[in-house]
Amino acid sequence: MSRNTEATDDVKTWTGGPLNYKEGFFTQLATDELAKGINEEVVRAISAKRNEPEWMLEFRLNAYRAWLEMEEPHWLKAHYDKLNYQDYSYYSAPSCGNCDDTCASEPGAVQQTGANAFLSKEVEAAFEQLGVPVREGKEVAVDAIFDSVSVATTYREKLAEQGIIFCSFGEAIHDHTELVRKYLGTVVPGNDNFFAALNAAVASDGTFIYVPKGVRCPMELSTYFRINAEKTGQFERTILVADEDSYVSYIEGCSAPVRDSYQLHAAVVEVIIHKNAEVKYSTVQNWFPGDNNTGGILNFVTKRALCEGENSKMSWTQSETGSAITWKYPSCILRGDNSIGEFYSVALTSGHQQADTGTKMIHIGKNTKSTIISKGISAGHSQNSYRGLVKIMPTATNARNFTQCDSMLIGANCGAHTFPYVECRNNSAQLEHEATTSRIGEDQLFYCLQRGISEEDAISMIVNGFCKDVFSELPLEFAVEAQKLLAISLEHSVG
């Protein structure tokens, strides 16, 4: 069931075509990969490769059986052909070449440096080319995920001194079993939806984070997801728990090689925030967007946070510039009294990209507050949709929501769509909703051109100003990166 590719030191970069996507290289290396297809034996094989206990296998099998009873959804404001799930491989990892590769998943296989047997010289070279530090040096902790496995996690020992757990999901299953069993599937059940059920059945490595009571995480935590193998899907499972009176800021980034066929990314993120705790969760999404309506990543993700305790706070911030189709709604369940949910989003589509993204704010506790700031930019022949739900439950006395949804059109062939849903079951609630749709004005462009600014630079400046409310919520270095990605995505959208 495994496949080996000749291992070389060569890291090949894709430079062809009009698309400027410098992350589109692929890395040649030996891989341990399951044959294409999904069935109960494949689910068992994934669990066996990861040396998982019986309870985790049962979680997978229950989700797989639920998934078989579900139908693939197509209600989004975008089109994709029905996927052949037998045409994907559901496990791919760098191979050491000496065994069946389960050694890197065994308890104790992770070295003090945070690296394991999956971190080959080819994998390290790939992350170096991406600018992702898999060795300690920069003051940001990184969990590097390559296809189905975590290959390195930095600053684990330093964080452990304060009781912070920062490790791969696979390692957490072995070393922090009680915590994983306590929280796994509590926010996103294994049968939550079609793609969440698929994820639960074939889940690959994501990141597990636990911040103990009264601890403020001393550095940014981050995960970088890299898809390398062809005809594989990535199905990471991430769990983040902030105990009482704690704080953590977490960032994720991603990229994939240029391929001429779709690849599936169906992740699940569960965040649990206890009393007086705060979590900031930032995403800079840069999956391969496809080229001339060919290939790209299908980014079908379920992200959900539970503000369990009083005065808890969750902030989602996302910059979405990649993937052929983006379909995700990072959500907050505001159960604790006085809890706060925030959603800040920039979604840019160009070329033939399609996006249907937004958020859900579910108010349950008293005096809960939510803020939604969404900026959508459409260029080329793309379609960009915002879809949001604000739900005020009967118990949510004095709940408040503010929603601002702005769309910008660049060119005559793109589209922007808005689908706001409001359900209010408590008459003490206050809800505000603002929405605008605009084009870049000719007078704005003329003003810039008269001052020697090129048309592309002028559009980039105007769009960055349009998005400043969201970029200001990102950590500084990631805000700069998000602005660069925005400019690159707009390069061929003028005219």
Curated annotation (Swiss-Prot):
Recorded name of the encoding gene: sufB
Gene Ontology BP terms: iron-sulfur cluster assembly
Annotated organism of origin: Shigella flexneri
Job description of the protein: The SufBCD complex acts synergistically with SufE to stimulate the cysteine desulfurase activity of SufS. The SufBCD complex contributes to the assembly or repair of oxygen-labile iron-sulfur clusters under oxidative stress. May facilitate iron uptake from extracellular iron chelators under iron limitation.
Quaternary assembly: Part of the SufBCD complex that contains SufB, SufC and SufD.
Recorded family membership: Belongs to the iron-sulfur cluster assembly SufBD family.
Protein name: Iron-sulfur cluster assembly protein SufB
Entries under Pfam families matching the protein: SUFBD_core, SufBD_N
SUPFAM superfamilies for this protein: Stabilizer of iron transporter SufD
Domain of life of the native organism: Bacteria
NCBIfam families in the record: PRK11814.1, sufB
